[in-house]
A protein has these predicted regions:
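A short, N-terminal amphipathic alpha-helix
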Residues: 83-102
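Short beta-strand/loop segment that forms part of the nucleotide-sugar
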Residues: 101-110
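Conserved alpha/beta core of the MobA/IspD/sugar-nucleotide pyrophosphorylase nucleotidyltransferase superfamily
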Residues: 218-279
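Short phosphate-binding loop-to-helix
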Residues: 118-154, 215
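Intrinsic disorder/low-complexity segments
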Residues: 3-54
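N-terminal nucleotide-binding beta1-loop-alpha1 segment
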Residues: 52-71
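Conserved donor-nucleotide/metal-binding helix-loop-beta segment in metal-dependent transferases, i.e.
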Residues: 165-189
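Short, glycine-/small-residue-rich phosphate/pyrophosphate-handling segment
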Residues: 202-222
């Protein structure tokens, strides 16, 4: 998806991160299904009947200073960047609460045992899993395949870099999947913030130049080559740099689409650093 979903070293985080589910680094792990957090395993998906439910899988990093939003530093300090990232993750989870007929998973990096993720799971009764794969494409392919192996009728993968991602995006994606094989939510930098499907689509993630502005175009070309019909959501701006923050707040001034938590953090950061530029 958009930029969230790249392997999570600080070095990679500083590069342009188009084409990942705005969220977090990807850890390598065994090629089995994502493990659920122990307290949520029992009784998971009790309403699941004949593939009637969907899955939303949010890719996220733990908000560790120096490991997230590094392309905003400077002007932000590492702890400010981590605070912003944590707000984005929490709001991404909370904005799924109104959805019905879906189970919510949080795909975690560096791992689902991190206290930040355990707290979110306990508070919102979401399911946790690890990101599994050597690169972004493998992680997304694994997550989708695991969802379908569990019997879900469709699965949507998203990141956490789109502050105004809301229920309408998920509802529109689900509607598009009724007549398409794949749905993508483009970002303005050439990546995507959401990818959804009704069945495994490994072709979509093969030989993609992750962290470039070619991700969306290459992904659509792979889909076309595989005979997959693609539906597109409206494009959105993700937050990778402080210039993105400035631009987003200008654009949102009339729309008022920001959740309160992230909105407060962004406005505070603008007050502190509004005229600053990277050194």
């Amino acid at each position: 998806m958009s930029r969230s979903g790249n392997a999570g070293s600080s070095r990679r985080d500083r590069r342009k991160r188009s084409g990942r589910p705005s969220g977090g680094p990807h850890r390598q792990g065994p090629a089995d299904e994502p493990a659920l957090s122990p307290e949520l395993v029992e009784g998971a998906c009790p309403e699941l009947v004949e593939g009637s439910k969907g899955a939303i899988i949010i890719f996220a990093k733990a908000p560790a200073p120096g490991e997230v939003k590094t392309r905003m530093c400077p002007p932000l300090a590492p702890d400010e960047a981590a605070s912003l990232h944590g707000s984005l993750v929490m709001d991404a989870v909370e904005r799924t609460r109104s959805l019905r007929g879906v189970d919510i998973f949080l795909a975690c990096s560096p791992g689902m045992d991190h206290p930040f993720f355990q707290t979110l799971a306990a508070r919102h009764r979401i399911r946790l899993c690890d990101q599994v794969g050597a690169d972004l494409g493998q992680c997304m392919d694994h997550a989708l395949t695991a969802a379908f192996n569990r019997g879900y009728a469709h699965a949507l993968l998203v990141g956490t870099d789109i502050p105004n991602l809301a229920a309408r995006h998920y509802q529109r994606a689900k509607a598009l999947l009724q007549t398409t094989d794949v749905v993508l939510g483009p970002t303005e930098d050439g990546g995507y913030y959401l990818v959804g499907a009704k069945h495994p689509v490994p072709e979509l993630f093969a030989d993609i130049s992750w962290s470039t502005g070619e991700v969306l175009a290459q992904s659509r070309a792979r889909a076309d080559r595989a005979g997959l019909v693609v539906g597109l959501l409206d494009p959105e701006r993700d937050l990778d740099t402080f210039d993105d923050v400035r631009a987003f707040l200008r654009e949102d001034a009339g729309r008022k689409t920001l959740p309160t938590r992230t909105g407060n953090v962004l406005h505070t950061l603008i007050q502190r650093h509004g005229n600053s530029s990277p050194e």
